[in-house]
Amino acid sequence: MQKISLNRDERLNNNPNLNTKSIEIVSKILSKNDLKAQELREIYRSLGLYVVNLMSSPGSGKTTFLESLSTYTDMRFCVLEGDLQTNRDALRLEEKGVSAYQITTGEACHLEAAMIESALEALQKQCDMRQMEYLFIENVGNLVCPASYDLGAGLNIVLLSIPEGDDKVLKYPTMFMCADAVIVSKADMMGYFDFRLERVKSDLAQLKANVPLFRVSSKERESVIKVRDFIAERRTQGYCSTHQF
């Protein structure tokens, strides 16, 4: 199997599409984002928020998972929604009684720390964030770019839906190296697709040891509760993702 680059500098330097000047520019952008992400950690801490960054392909079920948390649990949370256009996902959550603020990125395929900082100020005008336990950031649907931008989250959770197939982990290794946990979503569709859960587990193990994996269906309350319990445990532990973006 082709060697997988685990280090950011190594990935940049080995990219045939980037020359020396381009690598320098990208490195500066990412370094600036890293500094802002560190500032965000202090802001989250001051607000008493435990932050979870949800990443996946478009349509993998990030918004549906958040709706399920609202339906099946008593978690006190608010949401920052990332999409290129429209506020449809934010409206879906608001209909469930969840305070949500939509970030529309235009042509940008990911959220950046500076976007979160300004959106957080807007969200604070919508709800009393000190009454919240958690902030969920629903990143732009994309298995590539969000993996390069630290948002200061305590947990980075990646969703992989059954219809996407079981081969994505090693095809998009940078994303799954970010993962503090992986949710295999739309688990109720397992019987309709040739999806090998053991392959996903094996591929994950090649990238990162002991990544918790959850099978989740929005139709199965207990599957959602297991993820809720995992997130709550990490919050109690004060866990902060050690992944270096």
PLM regions: where:
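Long, basic/Gly/Ser/Thr-rich N-terminal segments
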Residues: 1-12
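Nucleotide-state-sensitive switch-loop elements of NTP-binding domains
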Residues: 16-55, 60, 69-154, 165-167, ...
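Walker A/P-loop
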Residues: 63
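Cofactor-binding loop segments of dinucleotide-utilizing enzymes, especially the Rossmann-like FAD-
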Residues: 82, 161-162, 218
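Conserved C-terminal guanine-recognition region of P-loop GTPase G domains, centered on the G4
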Residues: 146-153, 162-211
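Canonical P-loop GTPase G-domain recognition
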Residues: 189-245
